[in-house]
């Protein structure tokens, strides 16, 4: 019987499948549940956005990662709604304390004219593969980074995020 390599914040990978990180982090990101997302983060993350024209951080602190993703110029924009859907997935065990998840991903985004979310301004969706890194930290599996590779975008994806993804110059961490 195949062993599940799905990392979990609640169980060891040897005890069986769990939805805690492989599914819940996407629910948290899409629902903007920042506290719950923060709880599954490793102390430092590898963040490589070079394949989507942005920067790479070999060791970004969890606090800096949270500041980046929750920033008003990125996913913290109250006028942006998003849902990240995971498709096909396979797991690569690097060591007893490190796993790489290879995920097919569709990220749907809708931007509204105001935070009341009544009038849609634009849509932008991305189809990608994503490497997600997981490490065991303090005996618990944690999300330790990502490396997306966009296959193609729909609609006006490049206009969804007013800061992080629409400006050509390098952005510094908040």
Curated annotation (Swiss-Prot):
Looking at the record's lineage, which domain of life comes first? Answer: Eukaryota
Q: Does the keyword field hold Lyase?
A: yes
Which keywords does this Swiss-Prot/TrEMBL entry list?
Lyase
Molecular functions per Gene Ontology: lyase activity
Active-site residues (renumbered): 84, 109
Q: What functional role does this protein have?
A: Scytalone dehydratase-like protein; part of the Pks2 gene cluster that mediates the formation of infectious structures (appressoria), enabling these fungi to kill insects faster. The product of the Pks2 gene cluster is different from the one of Pks1 and has still not been identified.
Subunit structure and binding partners: Homotrimer. Each subunit contains an active site, located in the central part of the hydrophobic core of the monomer, which functions independently.
What is the protein's name according to its record? Scytalone dehydratase-like protein Arp1
Upper lineage ranks? Eukaryota, Fungi, Dikarya, Ascomycota, Pezizomycotina
Q: What is this protein's gene name?
A: Arp1
């Amino acid at each position: 019987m195949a062993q599940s390599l799905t990392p979990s914040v609640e169980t060891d990978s040897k005890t069986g499948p769990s939805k805690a990180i492989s599914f819940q982090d996407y629910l948290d990101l899409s629902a903007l549940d920042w506290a719950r997302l923060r709880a599954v983060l490793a102390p430092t993350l590898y963040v490589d956005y070079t394949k989507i024209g942005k920067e790479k951080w070999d060791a970004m602190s969890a606090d800096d990662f949270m500041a980046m993703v929750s920033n008003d110029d990125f996913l913290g924009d109250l006028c942006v709604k998003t849902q990240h859907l995971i498709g096909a997935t396979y797991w690569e065990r690097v060591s007893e304390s490190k796993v790489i998840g290879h995920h097919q991903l569709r990220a749907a985004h809708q931007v509204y004219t105001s935070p009341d979310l009544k009038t849609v301004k634009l849509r932008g969706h991305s189809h990608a593969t994503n490497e997600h890194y997981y490490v065991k930290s303090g005996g618990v599996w944690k999300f330790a980074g990502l490396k997306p590779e966009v296959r193609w975008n729909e609609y006006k994806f490049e206009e969804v995020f007013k800061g992080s993804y629409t400006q050509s110059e390098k952005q510094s961490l908040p």
